[in-house]
């Protein structure tokens, strides 16, 4: 049962509230809390000079600022603390604040708790953004007033009073956001699970545990959608509290969605033929099947078919950039894990020139080498993980007795230059890093845009 937002308004008014992080996504939250009558202090590691004009903008509406290296040392005396998702709740500063009586929460927890609209929550290791966008587009096609947020779109909490019971909200949720959740969306999906974010999570078990929060607090009339082809997610049916639908690329599924004789079906009804889909790769067929399961009760077959056969993809996801001298360039900068890069490689019909490497999330690259060695013509590596990836591939190349040229570079500019020089007519060059961007770029979008800019200058 959803709580009425008036309860939150009564609760937060006059409270001493700390918001940790003054990034773009937290700024609407800070302003909204001020509007609701809270006494807000915003915390950030950056100094005033690096934050720019936002510091003055917040001070003008009465927000106090705590900035600099030791900013978390001053969390004493607050009634409520909104933490940024990637910060662990067991940090000493949060533990101390909680012991002193602070209520520690996040924007997403409070949003799901009080949102009057129907909430669709999507998580998993790969395919989250594409599936979130597909669900959003299908609901929109059916003429629902639809909002999209979480990891994509815009922060939604500040808009909660505009939302109605007959609206639809689609959220992409990360393991960081789910880690402290004690509330679940009414309709939840786990796309698949493979090791990821082990630089933040203690181990893979904790990562899986966090993902399960997307359905752990559901009620009996809620829906959980699971991937039948993924052993980990398939077994979660036993823990479900409500209804379950499954999707599969390889098995016939009667209570869910599947690919049968190249037809995409939901509950036995044909939606479209796989040859009519614009999205590349079998992994995107899986994303469509998952979306069908989520919206089956709310969207007609016609709307599903329209989106499935017209949607051409999301930026930075196997995105075609251009063809130069017979060589095709693709931007798959979103691929921040080995499994996502492998899915991208599988969408091409021939071995590619792969540009990979980046920030080390402490996840193994052996599965990428094992599954991808025969899908790569030339491997160009950069970033913190370049030697780690090189080592994983060299082991596989050695015992498979195959050949693959591996080139180490120091920048994106150099990577594209080397790829361009080594490519022959008919080749495919793809940026699919298998790693996060933080060693060289603030996010995967900026990384992808730099790659596109360099390619467009060729």
Curated annotation (Swiss-Prot):
Q: Which segments cross the bilayer?
A: none
Coiled coil ranges (UniProt) are none
UniProt xrefs under Gene3D superfamilies: Mur ligase, C-terminal domain (3.90.190.20), Mur-like, catalytic domain (3.40.1190.10), NAD(P)-binding Rossmann-like Domain (3.40.50.720)
Q: Which GO terms describe its cellular component?
A: cytoplasm
Protein residues bound to ATP: 124-130
Q: Which SUPFAM superfamilies match?
A: MurCD N-terminal domain, MurD-like peptide ligases, catalytic domain, MurD-like peptide ligases, peptide-binding domain
Keyword Cell division on entry: yes
GO MF terms here are: ATP binding; UDP-N-acetylmuramoylalanine-D-glutamate ligase activity
Pfam family of this protein, just one?
Answer: Mur_ligase_C
The record's function comment reads: Cell wall formation. Catalyzes the addition of glutamate to the nucleotide precursor UDP-N-acetylmuramoyl-L-alanine (UMA).
Give the similarity note.
Answer: Belongs to the MurCDEF family.
Q: What is this protein called?
A: UDP-N-acetylmuramoylalanine--D-glutamate ligase
């Amino acid at each position: 049962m959803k709580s009425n937002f008036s309860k939150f308004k009564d609760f937060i008014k006059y409270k001493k509230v700390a918001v940790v992080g003054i990034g773009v996504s937290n700024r609407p939250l800070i302003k909204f809390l001020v509007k609701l009558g809270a006494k807000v202090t915003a915390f950030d590691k950056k100094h005033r000079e690096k934050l720019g004009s936002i510091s003055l903008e917040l001070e003008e509406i009465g927000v106090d600022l705590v900035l600099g290296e030791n900013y978390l040392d001053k969390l004493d005396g607050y009634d409520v603390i909104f933490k940024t998702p990637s910060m662990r709740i067991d940090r000493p500063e949060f533990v101390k604040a909680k012991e002193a009586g602070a209520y520690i929460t996040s924007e997403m927890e409070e949003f799901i708790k009080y949102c009057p609209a129907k909430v669709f929550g999507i998580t998993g290791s790969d395919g989250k953004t594409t599936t979130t966008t597909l669900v959003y587009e299908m609901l929109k096609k059916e003429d629902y007033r639809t909002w999209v947020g979480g990891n994509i779109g815009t922060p939604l909490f500040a808009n909660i009073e505009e939302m109605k019971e007959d609206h639809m909200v689609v959220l992409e949720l990360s393991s960081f956001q789910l880690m402290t959740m004690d509330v679940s969306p009414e309709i939840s999906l786990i796309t698949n699970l493979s090791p990821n974010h082990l630089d933040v999570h203690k181990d893979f078990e904790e990562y899986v545990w966090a993902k399960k929060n997307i359905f752990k607090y559901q009620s009996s009339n809620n829906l959980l959608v699971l991937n039948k082809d993924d052993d980990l997610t398939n077994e979660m049916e036993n823990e479900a509290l409500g209804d379950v639908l499954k999707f599969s690329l390889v098995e016939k599924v009667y209570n869910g969605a599947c690919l049968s004789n190249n037809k995409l079906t939901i509950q036995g009804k044909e939606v479209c033929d796989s040859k009519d889909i614009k999205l590349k790769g079998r992994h995107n067929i899986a994303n469509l099947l998952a979306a069908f399961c989520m919206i089956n009760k709310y969207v007609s077959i016609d709307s599903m078919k329209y989106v499935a056969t017209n949607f051409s993809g999301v930026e930075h996801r196997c995105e075609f950039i251009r063809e130069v001298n017979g060589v095709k360039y693709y931007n798959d900068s979103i691929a921040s894990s080995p499994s996502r890069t492998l899915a991208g490689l599988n969408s091409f019909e021939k071995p590619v020139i792969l540009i990979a490497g980046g920030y080390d999330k402490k996840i193994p690259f052996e599965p990428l080498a094992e599954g991808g060695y025969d899908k790569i013509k030339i491997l160009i590596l950069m970033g913190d993980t370049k030697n780690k990836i090189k080592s994983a591939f060299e082991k596989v190349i050695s015992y498979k007795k195959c050949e693959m040229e591996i080139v180490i570079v120091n920048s994106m500019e150099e990577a594209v230059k080397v790829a361009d020089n080594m490519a022959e007519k008919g080749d495919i060059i793809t940026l699919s890093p298998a790693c996060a961007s933080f060693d060289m770029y603030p996010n995967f979008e900026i990384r992808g845009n730099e790659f596109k800019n360099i390619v467009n200058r060729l």
